[in-house]
Amino acid sequence: GLYYQSPFYKELRQQQIDEKGNHVTVLNKDIKSQRALHFILGADYTFKAADRNFKLSAELYYKKLDPINPYTVDNVKIRYYGDNCAKGYAMGMDVKFFGEFVPGTDSWISFSLMKSEQTIGETTKAPLPNSPSYNVSLFFQDYFPGYKRVKLNLKGVVAGGLPQTIPGQGYEAGYFRTPAYKRVDIGLSYQLAGGNDAIMDKGLFRHLKNIWIGADVFNLFGIKNVSSYYWITDAYNVQYAVPNYLTGRQFNARLIVDF
C-alpha cells in the first residue's frame, strides 16, 4: 500500500533564529506530504485442541517512510521540525495466540518486535517517536471451579520505553529511552442474572441477556511507569530530567448489561 499524509498547520511551523538572535516561528509553505510505502505479509492458522478453538495470527511488515517531517514530544506537546529533512523506515513482526484455554472463555497472548529509524539530514540517526522496540501482552480468563457465575480475568503488559529528547532541542542533541512500561490488572465478575434464570422472563429483564457486576484492581503491583519528564535547569545551565509518573494502583467497580 501507498499512503500520503497531507500536512496540517503544526507541521508548517518552523523555528528559526533572526539576525538579533531571537527565536521566531515562520510558516514553511514548501512542506510536502509525508509518504509511507507499506509491505505487509500476514497469516492466520485456526485449529482445535482438546475440543477447544484456537487461532494463531502472525504478521510481518516493512514501511518505507519519506519525506519525513520529524517531530519531538515534550509531555503532551508535539513540535515539528517544519521541514521534510528526514527519511526512515519501520519494520517488525506481530504474533498473537488466541483461544479457549479454559472452555467457554476467550484468552490471548501477543508478542511484538519493532525497529524504526529516521535519518535527519544526512548524519543524525534516531528512532521514530512512539515506537517501543518490543511488547508482550496477555489476557486470561477463568471461572471459579464448579461455579461459572464467578469469572476471573488477568491482564498484563510489558513494553519497551519510548525515546525522549531535551525540550527545545532535536534529536541532533541526543536522545534516551524511558524505562520499560509494566502493568498487571486483575478483575472479578459475578453474573447477577442471565441465561435460563427465571427472572429473565419477567418485565424488563425479557429484553436483557446478561447482567454482571465486577471489581478491578488496575496496576495491581503499583508500578511507577514514566509518562514523560519535567526538565529543570540549574544556575550552571545544566538540565535534569525529573520523571512524571502515570497513575498508580486504582480500584474500579463496574456494571455490565448485555442487550
What are these regions (language model features)?
Residues L2-S6, Q15-Q16, Y45-F47, L60-P67, ...:
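Transmembrane beta-strands of outer-membrane beta-barrel pores
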Residues K55, E59-K64, Y81-I166:
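Gram-negative outer-membrane beta-barrel transporters
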Residues R35, F47-A50, K64, G99-T105, ...:
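Outer-membrane beta-barrel strand-turn architecture
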Residues R35-F39, Y62, K87-M91, N130-V136, ...:
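Residues that define the transmembrane beta-barrel architecture of outer-membrane proteins
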Residues L2, I31, L41-Y45, M93-G99, ...:
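Residues on the lipid-exposed face of transmembrane beta-strands in outer-membrane beta-barrel proteins
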Residues Y9-Q16, N22-H23, I68-V76, M114, ...:
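Outer-membrane beta-barrel translocator domains and adjoining extracellular loop/strand segments
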Residues Q5, S107, V157-P167, Y190-F259:
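C-terminal beta-signal and adjacent terminal beta-strands/loops
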Residues G1, Q5, D30-N84, Y89, ...:
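Membrane-embedded beta-barrel scaffold of Gram-negative outer-membrane proteins
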